[in-house]
A protein has these predicted regions:
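A short, N-terminal "cap"/entry segment at the start of jelly-roll beta-barrel domains
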Residues: 1-12, 87-139, 224
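Ligand-binding loop in jelly-roll beta-barrel domains
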Residues: 65-89, 192-216
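Short, flexible domain-boundary/linker segments around small modular repeats
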Residues: 16-20, 43-48, 143, 147, ...
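Conserved hydrophobic/aromatic beta-strand scaffold that supports enzyme active sites
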Residues: 15-17, 35, 60-62, 142-144, ...
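Conserved short histidine dyad/triad with adjacent acidic residue
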Residues: 2-5, 11-30, 65, 128-131, ...
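Short hydrophobic/aromatic-rich beta-strand segments that constitute the beta-sheet cores
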Residues: 27, 45, 79-81, 154, ...
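Short, conserved beta-strand element in jelly-roll/cupin
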Residues: 29-45, 156-172
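Short acidic-glycine-tyrosine-enriched beta hairpin
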Residues: 49-65, 176-192
Length: 224
């Protein structure tokens, strides 16, 4: 059972919450790219070579499209998910290198070089990022991000993003009086094109799963 918060069939992108009783799937190539954040229970992913990876409540993981694996679930499980079912079936360069990806909030991060003060109200923050996964189409990406406090003006967001807050808190707003506070342990979903304003007064760390359509990626690259 589950509930979809977002479903764009043309893009092949959907996000929601999913609950399932125990089951064991068949070994086979995973048909989609999927980011998952486990809310309750656990699951073990077994790959072709017999390696088993168990993911439990509070943890996140990625199964890349094409990974040959088996889903083994011995208890009830509830998760948030983002699925990208690439309509173009972009060629996977090296299927043998695919693996279950486990983002870790303690992983090393690289400083983001911010160059445009107009993106912020007041001082530019210090931000860091660690990218874990970019799909074969270069549109679906998962990573770890952190930032010192900052305030950003409201504007339409150029991507669809599910964020899982690991540390700190942030107020997300549409600029029209609809403010929501998200703190460590919370998740927020923002669809592309939504009016989006970020205000944080403390250090924030999050996992992100972003889908940035190819045309937006190209425009962003051209703008840089």
């Amino acid at each position: 059972s589950g509930h979809l918060y977002y479903n764009d069939e043309a893009l092949g992108l959907m996000s929601g919450v999913w609950h399932c009783t125990p089951f064991v799937g068949k070994m086979g190539a995973y048909g989609v790219d999927e980011f998952m954040h486990v809310l309750e229970g656990s699951v073990t992913i077994e790959t072709e070579d017999g390696t088993e990876t168990t993911i439990s409540a509070g943890e996140s993981f990625v199964i890349p499209r094409g990974l040959v694996c088996k889903w083994k679930q011995t208890e009830d499980m509830r998760k948030f998910f983002v699925i990208f079912n690439d309509p173009a079936k972009s060629p996977i360069s090296d299927a043998s290198a695919l693996k279950v990806i486990l983002p870790n909030g303690g992983d090393a991060v690289n400083k983001v070089e911010l160059t445009d003060p107009s993106e912020f109200i007041g001082d530019m923050p210090t931000q860091h990022v660690h990218n874990y996964y970019l799909d074969a189409s270069s549109q679906f990406m998962v990573g770890l991000w952190d930032s010192t406090a900052f305030d950003r003006p409201v504007q339409p967001i150029d991507r669809t993003e599910l964020m899982c807050i690991l540390e700190g808190s942030v107020t997300l707003s549409d600029g029209a009086g609809n403010d929501q506070v998200f703190s460590a342990g919370d998740a927020a979903f923002v669809p592309k094109g939504a009016n989006y304003k970020w205000t944080s007064t403390e250090f924030v760390r999050k996992f992100y799963c972003i889908f940035k359509p190819a045309e937006a990626v190209a425009a962003s690259t051209a703008a840089e």
